Amino acid sequence: MKEHKARKRFGQNFLQDTRIISDIVNAVRPQADDVVIEIGPGLAAITEPLAKKLNRLHVVEIDRDIVCRLKTLPFADKLVIHEGDVLQFDFNGIAGKKKIVGNLPYNISTPLLFKLAEVADDVVDMHFMLQKEVVERMVAAPKSNDYGRLGVMLQYFFDMEMLIDVPPESFDPAPKVDSAVVRMIPVKHRIGKADDFEHFAKLVKLAFHQRRKTIRNNLKELAGDDDLQAVGINPQDRAEHIAPEKYVALSNYLAGKVV
């Protein structure tokens, strides 16, 4: 079969390190009857060992040439191939609690993570290869340089842990950045639940709009000092000093004031 050349427009970097591949599959812990979706199977580095353990494996792939390759693999009868853009894919269209795994294209990782948050209630767990810098932002704690909007929003939905450091030479072609594998497990009992999620999301986006400004300045169109203090937020603090549950509390407090 003709060798597949990685396509930059699809953000393709193919994992080839067998140790890393084994570590990822072991982290996923696939059981035969699990509902597993792999995003971006590429040259099937993770696909093959997953398929060996599963009765069926869903894969989402945008590259038509790779789709054609997948159909010729010895284990193709175990694959359910969904050709198309994962950003448009209906994860709820697959019944059952899902495990989702993938070496995610780094150029769409943030919008894809936000999309996946929307289906958190139907997910068992997720394991993704991402740019290490992105994973550090996802798992960051308040008062750290990496803590920001991405971390607040994803920590609302998931407990997350960085599992594996992955150097550039683990891929072909090698990316210019370090990578890491993150485990994401939907939280069973949130510290606080947003009464109006859209309002919560807007508030968090505004809070981190200008990181060097105080929370008072960034949220001036939504909240006054009295509102901030009512939920235990110091108006002089910056956004990165405020824990996710405080943003939830503030959003609910403000929503409760609207008549």
From Swiss-Prot:
Chief location: cytoplasm
The keyword Zinc is annotated on this UniProt entry: no
EC number: 2.1.1.182
Reaction equations catalysed: adenosine(1518)/adenosine(1519) in 16S rRNA + 4 S-adenosyl-L-methionine = N(6)-dimethyladenosine(1518)/N(6)-dimethyladenosine(1519) in 16S rRNA + 4 S-adenosyl-L-homocysteine + 4 H(+)
Domain of life, source organism: Bacteria
Gene Ontology MF annotations: 16S rRNA (adenine(1518)-N(6)/adenine(1519)-N(6))-dimethyltransferase activity; RNA binding; rRNA (adenine-N6,N6-)-dimethyltransferase activity
Any one GO biological process: rRNA methylation
Matching InterPro entries: KsgA/Erm (IPR001737), rRNA_Ade_diMease-like_C (IPR023165), rRNA_Ade_Mease_Trfase_CS (IPR020596), rRNA_Ade_methylase_Trfase_N (IPR020598), rRNA_adenine_dimethylase (IPR011530), SAM-dependent_MTases_sf (IPR029063)
Compartmental location: Cytoplasm
Gene Ontology cellular component list: cytosol
Binding residues for S-adenosyl-L-methionine: 13, 15, 40, 61, 85, 103
Keyword annotations from UniProtKB, A to Z: Cytoplasm, Methyltransferase, RNA-binding, rRNA processing, S-adenosyl-L-methionine, Transferase
Keyword Nucleus: no
Protein family according to the UniProt entry: Belongs to the class I-like SAM-binding methyltransferase superfamily. rRNA adenine N(6)-methyltransferase family. RsmA subfamily.
Classification via HAMAP family: 16SrRNA_methyltr_A (MF_00607)
Primary role: Specifically dimethylates two adjacent adenosines (A1518 and A1519) in the loop of a conserved hairpin near the 3'-end of 16S rRNA in the 30S particle. May play a critical role in biogenesis of 30S subunits.
Protein name: Ribosomal RNA small subunit methyltransferase A
Biological source species: Neisseria meningitidis serogroup B (strain ATCC BAA-335 / MC58)
